[in-house]
Amino acid sequence: VIAQMVALIVTVTPSIRNLPRFIFMMAGPLVTGLAFTIWLLFASRLRWQEKLALVIAGIAFPLIASQISDFDDALRTTMWIYGVPLAELMITLALSIWSQAPRRCLLAVLLLGLGWSSFALVRNEGFDGDYYAEFRWRWSPRHEDRLPELTPQSGVTPETSENADAPVNDLLWSQYRGPEGNGSSNEEIPPLDWSKNPPKELWRISIGPGWGSFSYNNQKLFTQEQRSEKEHITCYAAVDGSVIWTHADTTRFNEVVSGAGPRSTPSVVNGHVYALGGTGLLTCLNEVDGTVVWQKNLVSEFGAPIPMWGFSGSPLILEDKLIIFAGGPEKNGLLALECAAGNTLWGFPSTDMNYTTARPMTLCGQSVVVFCDGKGAHAIDPNDGSAVWTFKPELWKGPAMVDPQQIGPDSLIVGLGDGVGTARLEVSKTDDQWTVTEAWSSTKLRPSFNDCVVFDNGVYGFNQAIFSCIDATTGERKWQGGRYGFGQAMLLKKAGQILVAAENGDVVLLKATPEKLTELSRLPMLNDKTWNHPIVADNRLFLRNGKTAVCLQLVE
């Protein structure tokens, strides 16, 4: 029992890396359950009739609980994680309270029954970043059941459809993580003072589950969401949040930790919307009305397995190419497809689980696409998919969770794995020979799935659940202290400020300085688990999670 309690404590200790915590969470009940059963049967002083009764009860009550509970994968996992140690505790408690047979056995059976039947009262909607279960009363309505139909309200109007084929404004947010792919807004927004001029809420709507962000173009917002068995790519009017159009496919991705819904963010370029669903449907739509131009299934057409947490990388549009991770065999790993028709142009081998988006960079004067997988960081020639260089930092562990990010003419930072750390790479080229060196590796910034931003020689991001800043030159910690859970951040470059979407749904405004943590304001906003990246476009902050989307005007 003590060993099981230790395993549970390790599971929810944020300072420990996610993989060991996950192993303790799943293996702890198995190891301690077997040890407890062996002790009960062979080392305890119970009568054989009591041992038999407890074994029967220990098998029967979980089976009964599974029949009377709202028994899905999330609750099944919860019953394993919490039910086994609860059963051990109930038996130990009964034997400690009553030493006489058969009363001690009757009490143990009674407590076992009460413990296991309690799972019939709740359901589990997933886990947060610290692996705390999100329990809800079983009878409380599910969010998806309360969602209205996605019916176009505003239609296609001149305001929303004009200039759909015009070049995308490079100040706006037409692809995942913004115009430069680094979570930074270049808009002329002055420093914000929410104590004197708080943001004005323009609209708020209910939205389906999904962990992707918004993209923005021509006064329209594009995102992905789940509605029952339909996975939607939806276009909303930025002015009021009304539905302009939606495209639905009959597919549903769902997993225990984060629940249902797609994970990717659409890209909007040259009048088309490109989106990747959680089960691997890659779709090109007309930006104006949402009609299908082409669609590919990464699983059936490229032999790609669905990753544990679903397909999560967003389409990168580079001139006439769409670059996306599939993870299929041979050269069906990272793919380049024609934007116009979806035909395959090239492939780069990569079969590891991957949850990142490839990034275009210019290093040593050469245009490359940088992509991370279990083998390290790769620079790839976007013209033919050939490897320019590959480098694996010393602390590297897969799978890749956060995007690589260029921070200098010949330097970039990469995440080292889920909760492992961050490294800075320096790249040089002599004639045709490339050299990649590791300037530093830091365990002072250990992101899970949370991307960082860079400003004033500081790298700002999540050291697990604590917002932190490290020196971009040395990797040394500058400060740590923002308790924002496993959230996401973006940079208002002109204002020198950072907007953090905290995991609990709060919006936090920080001064972007490596000197110290300076929290300027914190506003409750979404009031639920929020893993989605915030975006800023046309003086408005757009934020969503798996239940709600909201629009805030930043400056009057």
Residue ranges: model-predicted function:
Residues 6-99:
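Membrane-embedded alpha-helical segments of integral membrane proteins
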Residues 100-126:
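Internal/C-terminal transmembrane anchor helices
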Residues 138-206, 232-234, 239-255, 291-304, ...:
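Aromatic (tryptophan-biased) beta-strands that constitute blades/sheets of beta-rich domains
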Residues 196, 202-215, 230, 246-267, ...:
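Extracytoplasmic beta-rich repeat domains
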Residues 218-219, 270-271, 319-320, 365-367, ...:
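Short coil/turn segments that connect the beta-strands within blades of beta-propeller domains
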Residues 237-240, 286-289, 338-341, 381-385, ...:
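Short loop/turn segments that connect beta-strands within beta-propeller blades
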Residues 420, 505, 527-556:
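Blade-level signature of beta-propeller repeat domains, shared across WD40, Kelch, NHL, RCC1
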Residues 420-422, 442-512:
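Loop/turn-rich, solvent-exposed surfaces of beta-rich toroidal or solenoidal domains
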